From Swiss-Prot:
Keywords: GTP-binding, Nucleotide-binding, Nucleotidyltransferase, Transferase
Protein's UniProt keywords contain Nucleotidyltransferase: yes
Residues the entry annotates as binding diphosphate: G9, G11, T12, R13, K23
Pathway where it operates: Nucleotide-sugar biosynthesis; GDP-alpha-D-mannose biosynthesis; GDP-alpha-D-mannose from alpha-D-mannose 1-phosphate (GTP route): step 1/1
Top EC class, one word: transferase
Organism (species): Oryza sativa subsp. japonica (Rice)
Protein name: Probable mannose-1-phosphate guanylyltransferase 1
GO biological process: GDP-mannose biosynthetic process; protein glycosylation
Organism domain of life: Eukaryota
């Protein structure tokens, strides 16, 4: 089987992290976002993953070449010369996806994190006999999204309603699809939306079905959702693979600490924290609802909450970092400095406090 991951744009909503690497390579749960998807695809027998990309393809490929051999899966790029929306990339990668086997192929949005129940999706797609199956997830406030209206008895998709004013349902597109090769015949090589142009036509032909996604789901394309997504991901690990989580007197709730990270004495870490490879957390540090990425150092008695600390950054002694502060790569927060929602571009030194949310350039 094959899979296409829609990598797409510039990741502006996750800046300053995406100033250093393309968004799918930003660490989430101590490994690049896209690796969670590739590993799950490999588990259900996918042999080739095509990345639909228009930004820094060489960076992506160089990075993922290491994982090709480790995972035993072929990873290739399909590069857009102009943005092609969410359907155009399928037409561009047609030769890679339609291999003559007749097997369906996966299409994934690279921002989506979930438990990736791909085996169940394959079974659902086969049993319903449709041309395409989309995964949907239930949300509390459907008026913010495009809602998928479906027949509960048959799982057949009837129509799509964009940001409904009145309640028509609470299921939204989860950005995970399984499509028959015939879907490629419906798509022209031009900027096209799969959600607004292709799927409604398949639904009109009674060929589109929707599977309700079990477990958690989050689009982690922006910082606040990234932090929420981390909480949901760690909750899922607690249920499915609790041995991967840290334990001990210094741990509160769900905490993921890489085996190469060093935690000092007298720290309190958690809930909902990821500490990445090679990180050093010195004595007496307090961490909650945050990510500390590869190679970062948190000095004695610093306090970090609801924030993202970028690669190789340093948070000084007695510093306090909170309220969706995002430090880009190699940022140095000096001792006793306070950051209230600062968004700091890479390679900066912060010598004075940031008292209200602002971008530091």
């Amino acid at each position: 089987m094959k899979a296409l991951i829609l990598v797409g744009g510039f990741g502006t909503r996750l800046r300053p992290l995406t100033l250093s690497v393309p968004k799918p390579l930003v660490d989430f749960g101590n490994k690049p976002m896209i690796l969670h998807q590739i590993e799950a695809l490999k588990e259900v027998g996918v042999t080739e993953v095509v990345l639909a990309i228009n930004y820094q393809p060489e960076v992506m490929l160089n990075f993922l070449k290491d994982f090709e051999s480790k995972l035993g899966i072929k990873i290739t790029c399909s590069q857009e010369t102009e943005p092609l929306g969410t359907a155009g990339p399928l037409a561009l990668a047609r030769d890679k996806l339609a291999d003559g086997s007749g097997d369906p192929f996966f299409v994934l949005n690279s921002d989506v994190i979930s438990e990736y129940p791909f085996a169940e999706l394959i079974q659902f797609h086969k049993s319903h006999g449709g041309e395409a199956t989309i995964m949907v997830t239930k949300v509390d406030e459907p008026s913010k999204y495009g809602v998928v209206v479906m027949e509960d008895e048959t799982d057949k998709v009837e129509r799509f309603v964009e940001k409904p004013k009145v309640f028509v349902g609470n299921k939204i597109n989860a950005g995970i699809y399984l499509l028959n090769p015939s879907v490629l015949d419906r798509i022209e090589l031009k900027p096209t939306s799969i959600e607004k142009e292709v799927f409604p036509r398949i639904a009109a032909d009674n060929g589109l079905f929707a599977m309700v996604l079990p477990g958690f789901w989050m689009d982690i394309g922006q910082p606040r959702d990234y932090i929420t997504g981390l909480r949901l991901y760690l909750d899922s690990l607690r249920k499915k693979a609790p041995a991967k989580l840290a334990s001990g007197a210094h741990v509160l709730g769900n905490v993921l600490v890489h085996e190469t990270a060093v935690i000092g004495e007298g720290c309190l870490i958690g809930p909902d924290v990821a500490v990445g490879p090679g990180c050093v957390v010195e004595a007496g540090v307090r961490l909650s609802r945050c990510t500390v990425m590869r190679g970062a150092r948190v000095k004695k008695h610093a306090c970090i909450s609801s924030s993202i600390i970028g690669w190789h950054s340093t948070v000084g002694m007695w510093a306090r970092v909170e309220n969706m502060t995002i430090l880009g790569e190699d940022v140095h927060v000096c001792d006793e400095v306070y950051s209230n929602g600062g968004v700091v571009l890479p390679h900066k030194e912060i010598k004075s406090s940031i008292l209200k949310p602002e971008i530091v350039m």
